Amino acid sequence: GHFRDEATLKIPKKFKRKGYKVSLIFMGLSDPEQSELRVLDRAKHGGHNVPVYEINSNFYGNLVMLNKNFKLFDELLVIDTSKSVQHEVLLQMNNTKLLFYTQSKRLPTWFVKFLPKLTALINAEEAKNNSAK
């Protein structure tokens, strides 16, 4: 699903209020054009199509909302699916604590550009680890 605006966060917030653990696996792509190509390929093979304006809205809206609301999720996994062969886990968090992260110098441009709060957490963790050495 998509959570490109505040209204779509009502469901995870409701579950959280009721005491459930809320997890998100976020699969990112490098740009909306890559998303368009994947949608076209899916539609060509019998899957559902999505209008280009919705693809763009989903692409940017999802990133904005993740950056703004990542603390809502008890568990968060961010995966780069830009490469069709091998996907890469970029970040794993549990209760806003980093369990795993890709080094900041290896993060894809889309992550750094659209997820500055998560990038800042990685940078802070790297700085902390470097000062402890």
Per-region residue spans from a language model:
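Weak global preference for isoleucine
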Residues: I11, I25, I55, I79, ...
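Conserved nucleotide-binding/hydrolysis micro-motifs of P-loop NTPases
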Residues: F3-D5, G28-Q34, K83-V85
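NTP-dependent small-molecule kinase module
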Residues: K68-K133
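Glycine-rich phosphate-binding loop used to anchor ATP phosphates in small-molecule kinases
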Residues: G1-F26, F59-N62, L77
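A glycine- and Lys/Arg-enriched "phosphate-lid" helix/loop adjacent to the NTP-binding pocket
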Residues: K18-M65
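Short, glycine/charged-enriched secondary-structure capping and boundary segments
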Residues: I11-F15, R38-D41, L91-M93
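Residue-level signal for the start and early helices of compact helical domains
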Residues: K13, G46, V64-N67, Y101-T102
